[in-house]
Amino acid sequence: MRIIVIGRTGFIAPHIVDRLCERGHDVVDDEGGVADAVVCVHAFTQEDAEAAVRLFRGRTGKLVVLSSGDVYRAYGVLKGIETRELEPVPITEDSRLRTTLYPYRNDPKFADYEKILVERTVMNVSDLPACILRLPAVYGPGDRHHRFGNWVKQMVDGSPMIQIGAGMAGWRWTHGYVENVADAIVLAATDRRTGGRIYNIGEEVVPTTRERLEAFAQIFGWSGTVEVVPDDMALDFRQDMAVSTARFRRELGYADLISVEEAVSRTIAWERSALTG
């Protein structure tokens, strides 16, 4: 297949390109050409989505757009921008979306960010089949957020104790290892059944934050203790962000190629090298 990847820099996109090439697909930079599928990595605003529709309408068989779990009402509850009524978990593709738009309006860099409007824009075009992938918290080598860097640093430093807030300790948030997420994106781009579909992406099992920390500790070989301490509850951690990925796995036969244990091991190794590099 001939596939265009828009937004080829950054954390996830290089893995997408690598996997497409490994599978024998023709990955091209020509945004003015014709393609079997287009993967739009960096569509953050309604304007971004409208530009993609204008550019590729009539020139591709499918537009795959990366979205986020922050579209769900559960995220608004967590952030305190929706009413405090909790959403049931696991969150499915049919769960309620936020009613309050622009969740990062107070941040000038992301004031116009809104994946709900991105999704709405591309899914409402009758002659441009689209597939929406709602991504989890993505981790692994190259993660500019260093999601687990603080844990690894404390383990490297030989800290006897790692503290974690009481609210976060029992909170569940779906994550995904970057190479597995890239594999899922490639499958969605190359499988002809995904047009018009919305899928959650991420690991099948969602541990609590404490359980995740303990898994890191075991794989690292850290023998300290985890201490749960009071936190200021800036977020409403009563609301889990655990999503179901059953639809994607069932409809497309998807399974993670890299185990959680191996993903954590690779992440630890990268974080350790980042500390010394």
Where are these regions (language model features)?
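Conserved Rossmann-fold NAD(P)-dependent oxidoreductase catalytic core, especially the SDR/UDP-sugar
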Residues: 51-116, 123, 131
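Mid/C-terminal beta-alpha module of Rossmann-like enzyme folds, strongest
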Residues: 184-234
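Conserved beta-loop-beta element that borders a ligand/cofactor-binding pocket
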Residues: 118-142
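A conserved pocket-lining segment of Rossmann-fold NAD(P)-dependent short-chain dehydrogenase/reductase
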Residues: 154-176
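N-terminal Rossmann NAD(P)H-binding glycine-rich loop of SDR-like oxidoreductase domains
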Residues: 2-25
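Conserved C-terminal active-site "lid" loop/helix of NAD(P)H-dependent oxidoreductases
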Residues: 178, 232-255
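Amphipathic terminal alpha-helices
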Residues: 259-277
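Substrate-binding strand-loop-helix patch
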Residues: 142, 170-179, 198-219, 258, ...
